[in-house]
Amino acid sequence: MAKKPASTEVAIHELIAGRWSPRAYSSEPVSRDQLRAVLEAARWAPSSYNAQPWRFVVFDRSVDEVAFKKAFATLVPFNQGWNAPAPVLIAVTAHTLTSKGDVNRCALYDAGAAAMSLVLQAHALGLAAHQMSGFDVNAFRTTFELPKDVEPIAMISLGHYGDVDKLDPVLREREKAPRQRVALAEIAYGGGWKKAF
C-alpha cells in the first residue's frame, strides 16, 4: 500500500502515524481471515460499562453481490465514484439504548473507538480502509430493516490499495498530497478551556 506517514510534532507509533484514508482501491477480494481479523480488533475496543454497543454489518462483494450493491446504493454519488472497485463495505452501527432501556450516551463514542480499532488493524494488515459519513442513513435503515434503537453511524470501505492514476484528476491530487492536521496547541488545553498545555 502507498505510504503517507503523518508529519507529527512528537514521535508516535507507526500504526497511528501510518494510517490514512486512501481512495484508490483495487478489486482484489479481501480474505475471510483478514475480515475476521479487523472485526476481532473492533470487538476488543473499550466501551463504557463494557456495554459493547457497536454492531458491524459486512458487505463482501465476493460473497453476496446483491447485498453489497444495496449497501453501495446508499453511498452519496461522490463516494460511489471512487468506491466502485472496493470489494468490501462495512456499516458501523450502535445500539443507542442500554440493556435496561436507558439512553446510552456513550454509544456513538464507543462505536467510534471500535471503528478506529478496525481501521488500525486493517492498516497493520496492509489493507486500505476509508471511513465515511457520506451515505443515506434513512435509506440504509430501511433497506436493511434496522431496529429502532440501532443507529447507523458510518460506512467503511475496505480493500487492497489500487492504482492512483485511475482516480479522477482532482482526487488523484488529493491522494498524493501530504496529510494535514491542526496544531497540537489547538486541540489540547492545560487546566482549563483554551489554556496552554
Feature roles, as predicted:
Residues M1-F197:
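Acidic, surface-exposed loops and disordered segments
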